[in-house]
Curated annotation (Swiss-Prot):
It catalyses: acetate + ATP + CoA = acetyl-CoA + AMP + diphosphate. Keywords: Acetylation, ATP-binding, Ligase, Magnesium, Metal-binding, Nucleotide-binding. One of its GO terms (cellular component) is cytosol. The gene is acsA. Catalyzes the conversion of acetate into acetyl-CoA (AcCoA), an essential intermediate at the junction of anabolic and catabolic pathways. AcsA undergoes a two-step reaction. In the first half reaction, AcsA combines acetate with ATP to form acetyl-adenylate (AcAMP) intermediate. In the second half reaction, it can then transfer the acetyl group from AcAMP to the sulfhydryl group of CoA, forming the product AcCoA. It is an enzyme of class 6 (ligase). Gene3D superfamilies: 3.30.300.30, N-terminal domain of ligase-like. This is Acetyl-coenzyme A synthetase. Signal peptide: none annotated. CoA binds at R191, G192, G193, R194, T311, N335, S523, R584.
Amino acid sequence: MSSQSLYKVSGNIAANALVNNEQYKTMYQESIVNPEGFWREHGKRIDWIKPYTKIKKTSFDDHNLSINWFYDGTLNASANCLDRHLAEHSDRVAIIWEGDNASEQRKITYGELHADVCKFANALRSQGVRRGDIVTIYMPMVPEAAVAMLACARIGAVHSVVFGGFSPDSIASRVIDGKSKVVITSDEGMRGGRAIPLKRNIDDALNHPDVTSVEKVIVLKRTGGKIDWVEGRDVWWHSLLETASEHCQPEEMGAEDPLFLLYTSGSTGNPKGVLHTTGGYMVYASMTHEYVFDYKAGEVYWCTADVGWITGHSYMVYGPLANGATVLIHEGVPNHPSPARLGEMIDRHKVNILYTAPTLIRALMAEGKQHFDQFDGSTLRIMGSVGEPINPEAWRWYHEVIGHEHCPIVDTWWQTETGGILITPLPGATDTKPGSATRPFFGVQPALVDNMGNILEGENEGNLVLLDSWPGQMRTVYGDHERFVLTYFKTFRGMYFTGDGARRDEDGYYWITGRVDDVINVSGHRLGTAEVESALVSHELVAEAAVVGYPHDIKGQGIYAYVTLTRGTEESEELRQELRQWVRKEIGALATPDLIQWASGLPKTRSGKIMRRFLRKIAANEVTNLGDASTLADPAVIETLIETRLNRTE
């Protein structure tokens, strides 16, 4: 194996991990050669009401698409997260909650969570919710968000969680598409010291003329802030629980019955409702959580994602709770009121496993490691990264400052559509390379293809596809199956197209290069924007960078970089030239940025993803029609970038 920046698995970790490298190779080979046998065995990791006898009926043929797993079995997702732990672990803490203000903390045992979920499930039934109904959840990061999801699953309702930062228009489009009968929200949420007007946003969304399906709005009292009230429609959460029973028999659901809808963010046009079903999803979420994070019984696990994203669904609620973990939920942001908050929470709650995003790591990097001088971190064992490719510089900082150079990092690649992690290191099995997602999880068959769909062998770069199904895969786009087929299975026949580009190195490791539309063609040569961004961020004065292509008379496309400098660094023409030479040295002359624009901030969604379509338009000087900016955390960033753009033609 190439030794360049290789972090080897320590003997101690390999000896104590669920799987070592030899076991990984054996299990992976079996999962590909004999998927029926492999998943027949591993499907037993969850509890079934009626055990399955049929494992897999799948086809990626776009004329005969079929995705079915464990399809004659029945189960209940809520029972798998709660009931099955009660006999032995009723007193184990299921959820540790810390509010935006650290003085607010709660601990909820599995027994208590079970009672809360049963009561709220009965409350939902009292408001007319029935099996198959769609319930929209628009909640802050409080335990009741998980309670609402599990209560829906308990009675066979389909939850559609909308991220608590989305605008009324975004909420309305999702409610309309799903024809939601009931909406669950809160008076307000708290984030970074500010109150977020959740109920007001719901009121505005439901005033949309095309919203006609909603009958009830259930409101949790979080802050006690002033809200408007619609008599006959609105009802308090606590009022419903006063008369609700703690006993609620879980509904028997088919493996292929829907569990939830989750609308993908950042897409143009109508929202895309990703539909996940029950059996395969629960098997895959619980299995990936256990193996990827090398989870051991009773450990404290902290996923910093919001419950409104797929990461919150799979790796804050369903996966960890199915495995009986103690889950830390944080209402605010882990760098408020100071960058020390992340370390303080790890120490305060004795966190063993941390799963967070590169955008947070880079934000902490920019503030400086002095904020972690008092950080102990001795309980931390495994660290994960999710959401986008992590640049090597941020990886190393994470490893050194947060992990104290003893915690393996699992850099995970997956999507809303995949339900769970697809490409990832395993802590006891995989030597890691900063920036690489490394190898596929069990049952996952990645491949690289050229633009004609020809499979590329060996060390190569191309479009990332998947050759066969896995249990956590989405089943359809809600209400638009043709869109599902067209988006994922028409581009490359017989394959699932991820929309991402990747390269495979000499060791067979995968490096995600970004969305295919984040590839720049400079003078006939393809350059992944992630590669140029990583080079820029490896400079000590650069906190964050985003790179896009723009029309260039000679090269076809030029390279336009937006650069945020570290705190206290002065912008100058000299530094601009230094960065151009830095990238030239790191990658080569071809990758030298043509234009570098200083950016005090980048346009991001509230989950931290950079909205590159805005950056592409600004770089191309197309600033009159930027499109919908409702999902941006701070729309004012766009105005600043437009005013300071470098590619003006007028």
